[in-house]
């Protein structure tokens, strides 16, 4: 925000250790600088709150009821409600202006404006420049996979990345193909990026129908990246970027083995796919372009204008049918696993 706009922004994190060893760059740690944090909150024109906090009684010890507040959701409402001990209806129906990450979550927040997860392309370029990458046109292909949870694809609709099932399929493939699998989690962000950049292929997530920041970062570094976006998520990406194409190799998990085998057999195809994905990201997910979604939202909130969605949610087309297709994919995945 500070680099690309004239907005003076500070990021206050109440608990930087919330993800354990999976750490990120920080600005202000509230627990280390509570008074500075409260002074910044008091002087701010706008408070951009991530996740849900009570405006009157919250861990920051400040009353936000008279401030311009913009809520920003990163999880589906039931997950937020469970951890905040608040009713789903209170979250979804809250009259304060709302943003929601432009992934699967947006279909459940009809009042929220979808916004992109922005990339620090300069930081990714520095990591790429500092990380040796060996060309392996005929040797073993290296695949990186970094799930943040080990929840099964069969037990949750959204709170999963299908890690157990994905790993079962990859292990089978490794037994008969020139494939090395680098699986990692709970690493500092910069280290995770270096591990990915050393790979030929990256798997984002292939079971829910959504994409994640991990896949965007991989494609920004020119890596061949597999993901699976359902029809609603695809439409949201199109509305956000204006592009009708996708940079992911878009494939559900049950169909991934054939796709991966083709990629493993062809270094030329991997190079082409990686370059195409990188070109798409640099042209359509450029931070300088996409940051306008935030700037416009801030301007609307400060001037008392409602936030406008560019893509309305239809219960049948955007929720019921994608859920039906997901159930079909899960059944096909079960058959795929049983055939092995």
For the regions a protein language model found, what residue spans apply to each?
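Conserved catalytic-core segment of nucleotide-activated headgroup transferases in glycan assembly
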Residues: 119-187
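A charged, aromatic-enriched C-terminal amphipathic alpha-helix characteristic of glycosyltransferases
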Residues: 268-299, 303-305, 319-321
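Aromatic "clamp/platform" in nucleotide-sugar-dependent glycosyltransferases that forms part
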Residues: 206-207
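Conserved donor-binding/catalytic loop of nucleotide-activated donor transferases
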Residues: 197-199, 217-224
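Donor nucleotide-sugar binding/catalytic pocket of nucleotide-sugar-dependent glycosyltransferases
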Residues: 93-138
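Extended catalytic core of nucleotide-activated donor transferases of GT-like folds
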Residues: 12-94, 100-104
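Short hydrophobic beta-strand element within catalytic cores of glycosyltransferases
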Residues: 224-233
């Amino acid at each position: 925000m500070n680099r690309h706009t004239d907005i003076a922004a500070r990021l206050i994190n109440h608990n930087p250790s919330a993800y354990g060893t999976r750490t990120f760059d920080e600005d202000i740690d509230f627990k280390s600088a509570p008074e500075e944090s409260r002074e910044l909150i008091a002087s701010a024109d706008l408070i951009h709150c991530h996740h849900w906090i009570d405006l009157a009684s919250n861990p920051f010890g400040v009353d936000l009821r008279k401030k311009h507040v913009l809520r920003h959701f990163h999880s589906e409402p039931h997950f937020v409600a469970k951890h905040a001990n608040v009713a789903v209806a209170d979250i979804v129906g809250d009259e304060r202006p709302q943003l929601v990450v432009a992934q699967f979550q947006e279909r459940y927040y009809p009042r929220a404006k979808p916004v992109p997860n922005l990339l620090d392309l300069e930081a990714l370029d520095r990591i790429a420049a500092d990380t040796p990458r060996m060309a392996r046109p005929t040797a073993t292909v290296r695949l990186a996979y970094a799930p943040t949870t080990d929840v099964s694809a069969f037990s949750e609709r959204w709170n999963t990345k299908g890690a157990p099932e994905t790993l079962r399929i990859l292990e089978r493939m490794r037994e008969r193909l020139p494939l090395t699998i680098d699986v990692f989690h709970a690493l500092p962000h910069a280290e995770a990026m270096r591990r990915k950049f050393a790979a030929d292929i990256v798997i984002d997530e292939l079971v829910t129908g959504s994409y994640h920041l991990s896949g965007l970062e991989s494609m920004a570094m020119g890596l061949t990246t597999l993901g699976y976006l359902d029809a609603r998520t695809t439409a949201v990406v199109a509305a956000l970027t204006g592009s009708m194409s996708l940079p992911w190799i878009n494939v559900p998990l049950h169909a991934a083995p054939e796709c991966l085998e083709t990629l493993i057999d062809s270094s030329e195809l991997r190079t082409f796919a990686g370059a195409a994905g990188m070109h798409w990201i640099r042209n359509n997910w450029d931070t300088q372009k996409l940051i306008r979604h935030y700037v416009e939202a801030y301007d609307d909130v400060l001037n008392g204008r409602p936030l406008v969605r560019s893509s309305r949610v239809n219960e049948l087309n955007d929720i019921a049918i994608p859920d039906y297709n997901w159930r079909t994919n899960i059944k096909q995945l079960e058959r795929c696993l049983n055939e092995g």
